[in-house]
């Protein structure tokens, strides 16, 4: 698999997850009570799971900003790094996948298994797997380039 294909797949996952976070943010800001999207039964479970943070879970405002920052902004930064071919692009993609997986584990702890959480858990696993391939391909292409340049400069002498 070529680096270009892996980079494109990683961009897909980054855009998809960042867009999902933006939509989730919009839903929670549009109706902080959660009634419109039938999320209101989740608030008592949040307060029960995190009693020391119960003051934050009177509505979904804090959850909305947490979702946007933790999954939206981090993936947006990763997308930027991938587009710029930054040396940390593959690592940022791996970290985004790990952060999403941690987020999903917290959701499993609070609410148990739900279809959306399981789906995003699978998306996180795909993002992590692709980022691992991305890292490996970047490393092998960097090693290959270094070996060619070493061969070229030592052959001239």
Predicted features and spans:
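Topology signature of small-to-medium multi-pass alpha-helical membrane proteins
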Residues: 1-157
């Amino acid at each position: 698999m070529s680096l270009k294909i892996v980079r494109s797949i990683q961009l897909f996952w980054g855009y998809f997850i960042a867009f999902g976070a933006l939509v989730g943010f919009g839903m929670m800001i549009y109706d902080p009570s959660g009634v419109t999207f039938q999320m209101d039964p989740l608030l008592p479970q949040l307060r029960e799971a995190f009693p020391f943070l119960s003051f934050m879970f009177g509505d979904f405002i804090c959850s909305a900003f947490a979702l946007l920052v933790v999954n939206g902004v981090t993936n947006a930064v990763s997308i930027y790094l991938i587009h710029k071919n930054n040396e940390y692009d593959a690592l940022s993609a791996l970290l985004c996948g790990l952060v999403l997986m941690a987020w999903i584990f917290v959701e499993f702890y609070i609410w148990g298994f739900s279809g959306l959480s399981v789906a995003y858990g699978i998306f996180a696993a795909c993002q992590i797997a692709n980022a691992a391939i991305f890292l490996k391909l970047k490393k092998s292409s960097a090693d290959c380039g270094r070996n060619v340049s070493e061969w070229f400069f030592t052959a001239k002498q």
